[in-house]
Amino acid sequence: MAIDRYDFILALYLARYAGLRIHECFRIDTATVERALRENAITVKGKGGKVRTVPINEQIAIAMRKQLERTPRGHKLLVSDDMPTDRAINHLQFFIMKHRDEVRDVDSDRPMTFHGLRHTYAAEKYQELINNGKSPLDAHFEVSRLLGHERPDVTNIYLASVGKGDKHEQ
């Protein structure tokens, strides 16, 4: 399936395990990845130019190293020089559409999407924070920060799969 598509693997891992938006992934260059590997966290510029730093796990680090080996220094990691960014994004989205049934959770009837991976990250991160002793309010604000959102109502959309009484309501 994606055996040699380390670019796609990395983008999917960044959504699933770090909550990055698709455009944030496709802006990443080699210098950003080198710093992320040193700091175990990636700094991205999100919507409205807001900068945030998100921790990366070992799966992301491994995928970053593999893609870094294939990318000339000073270049974008997920976009080749001869391809516009929007076309590279479309290729990833087509790949997801073509292979989503092979990787979909058996318990889910919803089709996998890139943005859906971000939702999964948010819900799991929230639950992890709660399990580690954070209050629902503190966990909600931490997930908001990690996603690059400030408004509680937007974060609530991401946390819709979490039980009603378990998340901060506006």
Model-derived regions, located:
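Alpha-helix termini
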Residues: 2, 33-38, 101-106, 129-137
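Active-site/catalytic core of tyrosine-dependent DNA strand-transfer enzymes
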Residues: 57-128
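C-terminal catalytic core of tyrosine-transesterase DNA break-rejoin enzymes
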Residues: 13, 118-153, 157
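Conserved tyrosine-mediated DNA breakage-rejoining catalytic core shared by Y-recombinases
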Residues: 27-64
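Alpha-helix N-cap/N′ positions at the starts of helices
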Residues: 3-7, 117, 138
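Basic, Lys/Arg- and aromatic-enriched nucleic-acid-binding interface segment
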Residues: 1-18, 22
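Short, cationic motifs built from Arg/Lys/His that form the positively charged side of catalytic pockets
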Residues: 7, 21, 52, 64-65, ...
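Short functional hotspots where side chains directly engage DNA or cofactors
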Residues: 40-44, 113, 138-170
